[in-house]
Amino acid sequence: MPSDIEIARAATLKPIAQVAEKLGIPDEALHNYGKHIAKIDHDFIASLEGKPEGKLVLVTAISPTPAGEGKTTTTVGLGDALNRIGKRAVMCLREPSLGPCFGMKGGAAGGGKAQVVPMEQINLHFTGDFHAITSAHSLAAALIDNHIYWANELNIDVRRIHWRRVVDMNDRALRAINQSLGGVANGFPREDGFDITVASEVMAVFCLAKNLADLEERLGRIVIAETRDRKPVTLADVKATGAMTVLLKDALQPNLVQTLEGNPALIHGGPFANIAHGCNSVIATRTGLRLADYTVTEAGFGADLGAEKFIDIKCRQTGLKPSAVVIVATIRALKMHGGVNKKDLQAENLDALEKGFANLERHVNNVRSFGLPVVVGVNHFFQDTDAEHARLKELCRDRLQVEAITCKHWAEGGAGAEALAQAVVKLAEGEQKPLTFAYETETKITDKIKAIATKLYGAADIQIESKAATKLAGFEKDGYGGLPVCMAKTQYSFSTDPTLMGAPSGHLVSVRDVRLSAGAGFVVVICGEIMTMPGLPKVPAADTIRLDANGQIDGLF
């Protein structure tokens, strides 16, 4: 089969106005970026306020493995399949970060015959949203140092500035730096560092804001430093929010593109799935719901991280509620969770599959604990055997009373996911229960952490290190105790040990640090080592990306 980029390049794309017509978006509401990309105007989005909303479908997954699950591919394939069976459907996805495109991951726009296009533009610069977010974040950093340089009227303690700088690139050399060197004219020297743009709180705020006014208000709440007497200093205090909002004004308009089958997709925002909530923008999701029968969206990593945050943070803040949840699994990944080495995954192994099923089982039960109906989408790989698929369906039916559906959208496009689409419609249009959360926000922050660890991760208890405990007490004292929590831990395990696969139980979840994201509206709980500025691997994807003799991009996935 051709590579993803070869498939994408061979596709005949529709003019973006034709794609917009499927959602009833008029030409005058589009700001075109070439022939196949457009932003949807703020005024048109505001005019949709009060319209009835369609069904929301959340796509999540088992705990990821190096074998791959194909969550974005399934999201795209399901959206295409829903359109094929007569439902007006739109997909809502996160924008890919530039850094990982040149690092380990390569491009991120689905795969095979279930892709969003134009692939090259989506992966490289797109409409400039991430550049706008980087610029807004950098402006805030400049204003903070400028305030300190010119008399420091807010009495900011230069030892307690929390606002690091950002760049949308994997660059380990920037993780820790010394700034303002070279003399008095350059400001006050201090230690600083860079994160990747998707780790910026501006990105999280961008993706949770309801509109421009809400964006500016949330930016103003971001705590960027402390005073000498340990009082919080916000971006509003340094008068940064107006100019930052101006930089973000156009970026906040959702981006409209299409799938290989010409169906609409909204790709907008892209926060980290560990130190942030890992979902596309609220504005894009709401826009999709008001224009389509079905809006299919995904949440980052496995259901223990992505789906939990989608519900406990995004749904809690916005009132959204999924009508159905798809948990993506693969035979390969379940065998890895059952102890099989990656190099041995091609061999049939029903025993390992059954052992690894414990991971899927816990994810299904966790999602059901929120009151949501679930179906399992089994992403088919050509090495899978019929016996393995039959055994997985049997396990799902007998032990979970849930349907598992084999999907072949990677090879067949939407036609390969029609059975999954029919199952999703049946769930979404069936009986719905009230949405429940893993915890109530009125409880103490430590109780919220414990609720997630014990209810969803299978942990016996939590262990909070002294530095984190001191900071939590400060958050409670400063009035932030009512915020939800955003767990930052390894995506590869229910525990904080990435090598502990399957469904471990009885472990301790150790809390190393906590961070306040007051603008986004949550407390980040850091369990283990979390990297906010990735590095490049020994052989980065950038090594093989080039322009060919015809000026076409080669090597991008």
From Swiss-Prot:
Top EC class for this record: ligase
Pathway this chain belongs to: One-carbon metabolism; tetrahydrofolate interconversion
Enzyme Commission (EC) number: 6.3.4.3
CDD domains xref list: FTHFS
Catalytic activity from the UniProt record: (6S)-5,6,7,8-tetrahydrofolate + formate + ATP = (6R)-10-formyltetrahydrofolate + ADP + phosphate
Record has Phosphoprotein as a keyword: no
Binding site for ATP: 65-72
Keywords: ATP-binding, Ligase, Nucleotide-binding, One-carbon metabolism
Organism: Methylorubrum extorquens (strain ATCC 14718 / DSM 1338 / JCM 2805 / NCIMB 9133 / AM1)
Any one GO molecular function term: formate-tetrahydrofolate ligase activity
Protein name per UniProt: Formate--tetrahydrofolate ligase
A single BP term in Gene Ontology: tetrahydrofolate interconversion
Family the UniProt entry places it in: Belongs to the formate--tetrahydrofolate ligase family.
Subunit structure: Homotetramer.
Any Pfam family hit: FTHFS
InterPro entries named among the record's database cross-references: Formate_THF_ligase (IPR000559), Formate_THF_ligase_CS (IPR020628), P-loop_NTPase (IPR027417)
